[in-house]
């Protein structure tokens, strides 16, 4: 199939340039003004911005095992609606992808249902228990984007050391959910701060995150493993990672839109404000923003975690942990970081597209020769975040009702038109 994106605006070295993008059989074959390119599908992108498709290295697509929350079909459609062309799917599934046979179940669903590039993680431990026998990383590494027990921390230094050694031998990456449950009281639901104390809710202390990061940095220094920290939320974590990078440790990390735009001051006793790790203090939020700007935090990942409406209807105490975010990430960050002057647009695109591609060795982009990974946005939109417009099964977002000034109009992934809200000439 031949596709032409006509008269879109591309940001190059700080300047907008009107550009056509020609795609043939899923590959970018030409870029330039007024291209002569006979195409089966021509999309008029005049007035819209063209970006490399976004990459999220931390999403929960829930299938196999929990299709009442999300499916590969609904989740990948939601990703395309958010401008994403590649996502890495976490392994807290049933069965957990801890063997060739179990991984094949997820791969078959991806092959049959995904409208974008979905890359599975395998679990670090058998059954994704955070302890005990490790998965056969050497056998699985060629079929996965990395290894994670996300949703659980790896419990002991001995288990993590062995995992790092095997991961390094397999030339893969560990994406670590850093959470030491020994720090968390029964019923821990939100940050151990003023809101928790005022409302009598058991709190989750910052130590539960930064202590295992501190442990793993030492192990990473020892083993040389490629290591990535998921959903960083505390100022101590940022400081530890900044120092480790200065020492040459092979470490990267991510944070999420909700940690950049919200803190515990914004909490309401609603399930849509409950996620793990929780919203922290204002000084944690400020440290995350500083880390994002100085490169300590390499990328933005949504930790898109859909649940059923019933599971999110029990307030902060009783609701399941997790919020959705894949459809709102760029509109929110563009509106509240770029338009407010807190962050250049080029940096936001790097943190959402280029940096995760580099670290996780993911092909695709907008240059000639790339596998086509392009998203088209209207940066003059005036919309309010409305969960009823989501393609995800999950609707729990702390940003419901927020005004945003960006809207996805088209997403192209390889030879697929993954999302289309443009009028089309044929």
Where are these regions (language model features)?
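C-terminal cap of metal-dependent C-N hydrolases
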Residues: 8, 315-318, 368-426
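Metal-associated gating/positioning segment near the N- to mid-region
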Residues: 46-113
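Alpha-helix-loop-beta-strand connector modules within alpha/beta enzyme cores
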Residues: 100-117, 166-176, 328
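His/Asp/Glu-enriched, well-ordered alpha-helical/loop segment
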Residues: 198-226, 293-294, 298-300, 305-377
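Active-site loop-to-helix "anion-binding N-cap" substructures in soluble metabolic enzymes
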Residues: 64, 89-115, 122-144, 152-156, ...
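Histidine-rich, glycine-flanked metal-binding segment
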Residues: 1-53
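Histidine/acidic residue-rich metal-binding segments in metalloenzymes
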Residues: 132-300
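Divalent metal-coordination and catalytic microenvironments
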Residues: 8, 26, 47, 58, ...
């Amino acid at each position: 199939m031949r596709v032409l994106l006509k008269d879109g605006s591309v940001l190059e070295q700080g300047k907008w340039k009107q550009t056509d993008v020609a795609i043939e059989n899923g590959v970018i074959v030409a870029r330039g003004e007024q291209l002569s390119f006979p195409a089966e599908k021509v999309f008029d992108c005049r007035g819209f911005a063209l970006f490399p498709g976004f990459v999220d290295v931390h999403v929960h697509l829930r299938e196999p095992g929990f299709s009442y929350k999300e499916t590969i079909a609904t989740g990948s459609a939601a990703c395309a609606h958010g401008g994403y062309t590649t996502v890495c799917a976490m392994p807290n599934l049933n069965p957990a992808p801890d063997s060739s046979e179990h991984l094949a179940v997820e791969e078959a669903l991806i092959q049959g249902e995904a409208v974008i590039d979905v890359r599975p993680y395998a679990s670090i431990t058998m059954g994704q228990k955070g302890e005990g026998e490790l998965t056969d990383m050497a056998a699985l590494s060629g079929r996965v984007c990395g290894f994670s027990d996300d949703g659980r921390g790896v419990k002991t230094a001995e288990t993590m050391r062995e995992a790092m050694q095997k991961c390094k031998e397999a030339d893969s990456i560990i994406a670590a959910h850093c959470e030491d449950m020994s720090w968390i009281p029964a019923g821990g639901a939100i940050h151990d701060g003023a809101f928790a104390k005022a409302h009598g809710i058991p709190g989750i202390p910052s130590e539960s995150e930064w202590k295992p990061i501190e442990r793993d940095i030492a192990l990473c220094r020892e083993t040389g493993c490629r290591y990535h920290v998921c959903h960083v939320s505390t100022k101590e974590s940022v400081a530890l990672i900044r120092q480790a990078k200065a020492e040459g440790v092979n470490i990267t990390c991510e944070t999420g839109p909700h940690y950049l735009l919200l803190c515990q001051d914004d909490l309401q006793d609603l399930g849509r404000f409950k996620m793990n790790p929780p919203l922290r203090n204002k000084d944690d939020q400020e440290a995350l923003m500083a880390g994002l700007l100085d490169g300590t935090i390499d990328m933005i990942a949504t930790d898109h975690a859909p649940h059923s409406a019933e599971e999110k209807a029990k307030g902060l105490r009783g609701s399941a942990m997790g919020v959705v975010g894949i459809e709102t990430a760029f509109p929110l960050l563009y509106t509240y970081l770029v338009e407010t002057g807190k962050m250049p647009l080029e940096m936001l695109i790097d943190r959402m597209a280029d940096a995760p591609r580099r670290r996780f060795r993911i092909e695709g982009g907008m240059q000639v020769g790339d596998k086509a990974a392009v998203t088209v946005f209207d940066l003059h939109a005036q919309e309010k975040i409305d969960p009823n417009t989501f393609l995800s099964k999950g609707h729990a977002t702390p940003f419901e009702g927020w005004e945003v000034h960006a809207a996805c109009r088209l997403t192209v992934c390889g030879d697929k038109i993954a999302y289309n809200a443009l009028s089309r000439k044929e």
